[in-house]
Design a protein with these regions (language model features):
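Conserved pre-motif I regulatory segment
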Residues: 1-44, 157
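The conserved Walker
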Residues: 45-49
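Conserved nucleic-acid-binding Ia/Ib motif block in the N-terminal RecA-like helicase ATPase lobe
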Residues: 5, 13-14, 18, 68-142, ...
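SF2 helicase catalytic motif II
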Residues: 141-177
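Walker A/P-loop NTP-binding motif
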Residues: 29-41, 52-70, 90-96, 138, ...
Length: 177
């Protein structure tokens, strides 16, 4: 199936074309329509099959189409590691290249205070998409640095790995916000 056969936003499609992506992988073909319909889902596929695009593309399309608060965090994507959070953020920048009003911030530990200050600034400005490791996000939550009451999309990337790493209580706490 081709991406242009799906109901993706034109700005997202333009970014895909620039990146030379034309056809969906099976996980994308199955997940994208369901997310566009607003359905919850559990996507399971091997590494390298396009799972990140399977959830990012429809979320970015929906955010760019409007109907979500401009001054709010609308999507939280949880990642078990800093490296994966950075990869997701890079994918977000590529897929969202033509989106003028959709912003993101990657939040993860293991860096200096300057990075924390940048995270705090992005959170206070209301980044649309927050990509975070559980521990670092809990830190921001406990300090009251962000309002998560208007989140419409909640993604657990590599959920099995996060649970194996002992993040189940953190995830429950974040999901209840």
């Amino acid at each position: 199936m081709y991406f242009d056969e799906l109901d993706l936003n034109d700005n997202v499609l333009d970014a895909l074309y620039d990146m030379r992506f034309e056809t969906c992988t099976p996980v994308q073909e199955q997940c994208i329509p369901e997310i566009l319909k607003g359905n919850d889902l559990l996507g399971v596929a091997q590494t390298g099959t396009g799972k990140t695009a399977a959830y990012l593309l429809p979320i970015l399309s929906k955010l760019d189409d409007g109907g979500y608060p401009k001054d709010a965090i609308n999507c939280v994507i949880m990642s078990p590691t800093r490296e994966l959070a950075q990869q997701i953020d890079q994918a977000m920048q590529g897929f969202g290249y033509y989106l003028n009003d959709v912003s993101s911030v990657a939040i993860y530990g293991g860096n200096d205070g300057n990075r924390y200050d940048q995270e705090l600034k992005s959170l206070s400005l209301g980044a649309d998409v927050v990509i975070a490791t559980p521990g670092r996000l809990i830190s921001h939550i406990s300090m009251g640095n962000a309002d998560f009451s208007r989140v419409s999309f909640f993604v657990l990337d590599e959920a099995d790995r996060m649970l194996d790493m002992g993040f189940s209580e953190d995830i429950k706490k974040i999901a209840q916000l």
